[in-house]
A protein has these predicted regions:
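Short aromatic-glycine-(Arg/Gly/Cys) micro-motifs in beta-strand/loop hairpins
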Residues: 1-16
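A detector of low-complexity, intrinsically disordered, Ser/Thr/Gly/Pro/Ala-rich segments
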Residues: 7-8, 23, 32
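A short, exposed loop/beta-hairpin motif centered on an aromatic-Gly-Thr core
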Residues: 14-24
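Short, mixed-charge low-complexity intrinsically disordered segments
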Residues: 33-56
Length: 56
């Protein structure tokens, strides 16, 4: 498992990021989007319009 920072843009234009542990970039992005859709991040948007993950 590696530590990734996931950068996302919501449907409201908010830029949010999350730090997650995952085994790949695609898994990290999936975890980040799930967190966003589940309301776990401090933002008003819940739909991810753009997403990218980088190793921390």
């Amino acid at each position: 498992m590696e530590l990734y920072i996931v950068y996302m843009t919501t449907e409201l234009g908010e830029e949010v990021d999350a730090c997650v542990q995952a085994s790949s970039t695609s898994e990290a992005e999936s975890i980040g989007m799930t967190m966003l859709e589940g309301g776990e991040l401090q933002c008003d948007g819940v739909i991810c319009m753009q997403c990218s993950a980088v190793l921390a």
